[in-house]
Structures are given as structure tokens and as C-alpha cells.
Amino acid sequence: DVVFGLHVTNAAHGLIAYREGASMAAADPWKITIKGRQAHGSRPWDSIDPIMVAFQMGNNFQTIISRKLDLRESPAVISVGSIHGGVRSNIIPAVVEMEGT
């Protein structure tokens, strides 16, 4: 027997909820560093824009879930929790970091 205290659940407060079979999943953290080429915002053709790559990756992660996995067999979620890159509004950065689970 085992008991878990959950911080994210739909169960009513003050009650004990249970179910038979699997009911939780693991969180597997990941971190990606995207390396591009910095350029001034007025000359985007001189850059390899890691921000655009990060946008596309975030969108495409959802395709993995909806098109590559049979969710009846293996429920899954991919979440992007943070995206960090750049320090100036008019400079395309050289590096962007993404993290999630």
C-alpha cells in the first residue's frame, strides 16, 4: 500500500481520492540550447535566428504528442516552461535556452 500527497489534482479538498491502476506519470525535465548567429535586428539575413527555431520547436513538440503517439496506449504531455534568449530588443541573439518537462 502507498499514499501520495498531490499538488496538482482535480480531487476535492478534504477528501481522499483513489483509483485502480496507473494514475500518475513521471516528469522528465529537459533543457535545449539552440545556437545561432547573432546579428542586428535591421539585418536578420545576417543571422541564424535561434528565437525563430525555438518558436518552431515549441509548436512541433505538440505534433509529437498528437501525431506520433497513440494516447490510448501512452498518455503524454510535453510542456515548455521557459525560453530565455537575448538582452536587447534590436539584436537577434546567438543563443536561446528552452526548458520543460
Walk through the language-model features, giving the residues of each.
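Histidine/acidic-residue-rich, glycine-tolerant segments that coordinate divalent metal ions
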Residues: 1-94
